[in-house]
């Protein structure tokens, strides 16, 4: 009868795969007779129909795909490996308040010049690096911040590479660029189970000593580095893990910098070296656009690392400067991308470490 209502909702979010067909059982649907095929096929869709008489039949009064709730960033971080004067595998956890903890005994092969990123939504991975020669081993990080033993490498052994998280669920990662006997541009995807895939042919200018971070909630960006000189070019990573061609550089060309996400959907490149130590930063918008230089805060340094913490904040830590070859200080990044002054270091002073977030 007139005014009758029916509601359909895709609670399982599978209509994009299976869809539904509504049979109006001899009645019209939006003025069309029963021979008209009515199909809906969008994940998360909700349809609310009402009967409005023989002429119009059933008519939809609501047809809307409900968006997934935003996936929050990880709460804690971890800095690991590096060079303390000799190669090390120690790690330092970062709390959800940005407090760096004391050293955790090494697990896995000591090395430097490696990279780290997130996978699985709440876990991390350290990979590749320099053990005295180029390496392709990886070490998974649990959602409790526990580093696992070595996993036999996949992909070209290299050092001076970078890595970041990507995908709509924030559950995959990518390692890219680096150095073997020269600068390279290949990449290796990391599945949501932490499995590293074989080399993908490089896109963009081959380079080493670059940095990478997430932006837009589901994408990544590699930037800066060194070819035959310092560069500021960037390469965006889609939410399918596809690296785009070079984007003309913005900001001071430099190498040995670090990057992390902040504000849940933005990123920041910071510090580095271009003939002298730098403390400048460059913010990355949620569209992957890199901003011009922001004046440096904190001790100018290079060969440091960075990660997010607290869901929407970041931290730069460790590294080296002109007067102190090994540092342990850190600088917090607010959810507005503002870098704070130096925090007294905790843990073994070192350079050329890596970092990622978890939990």
What are these regions (language model features)?
Residues 1-68:
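Acidic, glycine/polar-enriched metal-coordinating patches/loops
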Residues 36-40, 48, 63-359:
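Kelch-like beta-propeller repeat domains
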